[in-house]
Amino acid sequence: GISFGGQMHGLVILDENDKVIRPAILWNDGRTTKECEYLNNTIGKGKLTEYTANIAFAGFTAPKILWVRENEPENFQKIRKIMLPKDYLAYRFSGVHATDVSDASGMLLFDVKNRCWSEKMLEICGISKGCMARVFESYECIGHLTEEAAEKLGLTTDTAVIAGAGDNAAAAVGTGTVGDGSCNISLGTSGTIFISSMTFGVDANNALHAFAHADGHYHLMGCMLSAASCNKWWLDDIIGTGCLLYTSDA
């Protein structure tokens, strides 16, 4: 079978012919400050947490949808499907509009506790449920390769396509971070602290994301959008310079 893991939160919007309407707005795009303020202050952090287990951050998908609605109304009117980056690739392989619970959790459109779309959040964003992909657990088969995909890949049409997971959730499974209370730290373009939990829980201070995880579990995650590059700067420009000066003085 074939599966996908990839960056989370990005907005890919398709028209009635399943054609991409505009370039994807990725996780690290910070244009949605105004939309996040509206969601957190007008809708309210309490309601957002009730609906999705999370508050609005610029990286999440729902604020991006509101940005398109406000700034590109002609594109907003064309939307027939809303997808995440890895799920669009899976669609091109399978012809199926699908997502998994871990990636869906990062959209601010997903009822994390009940592992389904939040009708309240869809209403706030002006999106019908029909625009959303079907949600699967990460290990589930969403379909099989289309004839076109199978021919291009040199595979057969009975090759299963598996839902997969968002990048951090997939990495957590790979590092064995699935047991209750297990934890990992990831330093890349962004930096995360990831804690697996067998039970659903929301951070009362809204500092951590609460997402669905493997095997019916959940996870809490703290994230910074800039991580390894900051470490490199510290090592190269601060620690490195300091060491050179110390050596020179000696």
Show which residues each predicted segment covers.
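Carbohydrate-associated surface elements
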Residues: 29
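Active-site core segments that coordinate phosphate-bearing ligands/cofactors
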Residues: 33, 40-98, 108-119, 123-126, ...
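N-terminal glycine/serine-rich phosphate-binding loop of ATP-dependent small-molecule kinases
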Residues: 1-22, 50, 78, 133, ...
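Residue-level structural signal for beta-strand termini and adjacent loop
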Residues: 25-26
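A conserved helix-loop-beta module that forms one wall/lid of the active-site cleft
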Residues: 126-137
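Glycine-rich phosphate-binding loop of ATP-grasp-fold ATP-dependent ligases
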Residues: 22, 103-108
